[in-house]
From Swiss-Prot:
It comes from Homo sapiens. Testis. Is selectively expressed in the spermatids of seminiferous tubules. It is found in: Cytoplasm; Mitochondrion membrane. It comes from the Eukaryota. Residues 80-116 are annotated as: Disordered. This is Sperm mitochondrial-associated cysteine-rich protein. Residues 6-68 are annotated as: 7 X 7 (OR 8) AA approximate repeats. Coiled coil: none annotated.
Length: 116
């Protein structure tokens, strides 16, 4: 339906619009819009938006369009996030060990006093 010569690929969704050749492919969800040439392709679920040039096309797990519409920064830190989450549950365990450690040195002090 679109003139491929004048426009780039179109979005197969209701109310889709053609992108000029200088712009990237459109998003295919409500409020479809074309990305400027300096911006990357859009993600394609609800709230699709164009990613700035400093960001990757889309977030994991399935680029270039991911399930959750987000724009990822060039600095990929997906592996660091789960590590931080694992550290949080370890924190209370460390505190518990600290309490036990304080009790141990406290006991011998009590024994030393009656020994005198």
């Amino acid at each position: 339906m679109c003139d491929q010569t004048k426009h780039s690929k179109c979005c197969p969704a209701k109310g889709n619009q053609c992108c000029p050749p200088q712009q990237n492919q459109c998003c295919q969800s409500k409020g479809n819009q074309c990305c400027p040439p300096k911006q990357n392709q859009c993600c394609q679920p609800k709230g699709s938006q164009c990613c700035p040039p400093k960001h990757n096309h889309c977030c994991q797990p399935k680029p270039p369009c991911c399930i959750q519409a987000r724009c990822c920064g060039l600095e990929t830190k997906p592996e660091v996030s789960p590590l931080n989450m694992e550290s949080e549950p370890n924190s209370p365990q460390t505190q518990d060990k600290g309490c036990q450690t304080q009790q141990q040195p406290h006991s011998p002090q009590n024994e030393s006093r009656p020994s005198k």
